[in-house]
From Swiss-Prot:
<feature type="transmembrane region" description="Helical">
    <location>
        <begin position="174"/>
        <end position="194"/>
    </location>
</feature>
<dbReference type="InterPro" id="IPR035906">
    <property type="entry name" value="MetI-like_sf"/>
</dbReference>
<comment type="subunit">
    <text>The complex is composed of two ATP-binding proteins (PstB), two transmembrane proteins (PstC and PstA) and a solute-binding protein (PstS).</text>
</comment>
<keyword id="KW-0812">Transmembrane</keyword>
<feature type="transmembrane region" description="Helical">
    <location>
        <begin position="30"/>
        <end position="50"/>
    </location>
</feature>
<feature type="domain" description="ABC transmembrane type-1">
    <location>
        <begin position="85"/>
        <end position="314"/>
    </location>
</feature>
<comment type="function">
    <text>Part of the ABC transporter complex PstSACB involved in phosphate import; probably responsible for the translocation of the substrate across the membrane.</text>
</comment>
<dbReference type="InterPro" id="IPR051124">
    <property type="entry name" value="Phosphate_Transport_Permease"/>
</dbReference>
<dbReference type="InterPro" id="IPR011864">
    <property type="entry name" value="Phosphate_PstC"/>
</dbReference>
<protein>
    <recommendedName>
        <fullName>Phosphate transport system permease protein PstC 2</fullName>
    </recommendedName>
</protein>
<keyword id="KW-0592">Phosphate transport</keyword>
<keyword id="KW-1003">Cell membrane</keyword>
<feature type="transmembrane region" description="Helical">
    <location>
        <begin position="237"/>
        <end position="257"/>
    </location>
</feature>
<feature type="transmembrane region" description="Helical">
    <location>
        <begin position="125"/>
        <end position="145"/>
    </location>
</feature>
<feature type="transmembrane region" description="Helical">
    <location>
        <begin position="290"/>
        <end position="310"/>
    </location>
</feature>
<dbReference type="Pfam" id="PF00528">
    <property type="entry name" value="BPD_transp_1"/>
</dbReference>
<dbReference type="GO" id="GO:0051701">
    <property type="term" value="P:biological process involved in interaction with host"/>
</dbReference>
């Protein structure tokens, strides 16, 4: 039997140039998209700095330590951000301290304890809270929450007044227009952000780690404590910083709640005054004149830098593993 020799299949040349060209175009488009956010941030920073410098040069007060903010006379500008920083920091940190433990608890409940028929609608309700307008939170805070908090504020002031956070502030406790009230309202506002991100991070905990812990006899709480929470640490930090960013920049709700103060702040939760954002919003009518406008833009630039420092600190705390 004669067998025919095997013949090699003919090689067909494939032109890879269109694919390579498409890859280059896609890489260029992706790089351009990635560069857009960097360019936008740089442009914003340059705009703020350029508009702020003339007013800073004309300023007759120390920008960082002065409690004045007088822009009524172009020739005698005197403004500083000491009180703005104090009110912003106290209200935002109060919100963070109150919101994060509750948000983490809700996230753990939704991912590891709640039955599915309850988890989804409850999670949707938490997410829906983020859609409530800021002005609604502000009105609810000053008309509903503030009167309820007044007895608590008086109790804290009476019994813990020796501690600087609870001593008598620069506004009356009556009416509740204090940092204490603003911080609690802000904690409700940032709750959905921290909860939503923490929930998604906890859901990504490797199933094999959870099953291994259960196989070793761990209870559900021990699984959460030793597996879920350590795995989601950097995600919770990232969520907290996003919530803090929201609190730092919140304007309308804080403007509605906080009572203006005639005296400098004392680093008490029972002080009134303005945050960076609410001070800028309250003076929109002055933005027709360059130098007074520049004074408020200077405050905006300080807030801009503060948010960057907060995010840098978050990455350092999370060991560089903060996502987002």
């Amino acid at each position: 039997m004669v067998t025919e020799p095997l013949t090699k299949p003919a090689l067909v040349a494939v032109d890879m140039r269109p694919a390579r060209r498409g890859e280059r175009l896609f890489k260029l488009a992706a790089s351009a998209a990635g560069s857009t956010i960097v360019i936008a941030i740089l442009l914003i920073a340059i705009f703020l700095l350029v508009r702020a410098v003339p007013s800073l040069r004309a300023n007759h007060a120390n920008f960082f330590t002065s409690t004045q903010f007088d822009t009524s006379d172009d020739e005698q500008l005197a403004f500083g951000v000491r009180d703005l920083f104090m009110v912003t920091a106290l209200s935002s940190i109060t919100a963070l301290v109150l919101a994060v433990p509750v948000a983490v608890g809700i996230a753990v409940f939704l991912t590891h304890y709640a039955p599915r028929r309850l988890s989804r609608p409850f999670g949707a309700m938490v997410d829906l809270l983020a859609a409530v307008p800021s002005i609604i939170f502000g009105l609810w805070g000053i008309f509903v929450l503030a009167p309820k908090l007044e007895p608590i504020a008086r109790f804290l002031n009476r019994n813990l007044g020796w501690l600087f956070l609870f001593k008598q502030g620069n506004v009356s406790l009556a009416g509740g227009g204090t940092i204490f009230t603003a911080g609690i309202v802000l904690s409700v506002m940032i709750l959905p952000i921290v909860t939503s991100i923490s929930r998604e991070v906890f859901r990504q905990t490797p199933l094999i780690q959870i099953e291994a812990a259960l196989a070793l006899g761990a209870t559900k709480w021990e699984v959460v404590r030793m597996t879920v929470l350590p795995y989601g640490r950097s995600g919770v930090v990232a969520a907290s910083m996003l919530g803090l960013g929201r609190a730092l920049g919140e304007t309308v709700a804080v403007l509605v709640i906080l009572r203006s103060a005639a005296r400098p702040g004392t680093w008490s939760l029972f002080d009134g005054g303005y945050t960076f954002a609410s001070k800028i919003a309250s003076a929109a009518s002055e933005f027709s004149e360059p130098l007074p406008t520049g004074a408020y833009i200077s405050a905006g630039f300080a807030l801009f830098v503060l948010t960057f420092l907060v995010n840098a600190a978050a990455r350092a705390i999370a060991g560089g593993k903060v996502n987002g």
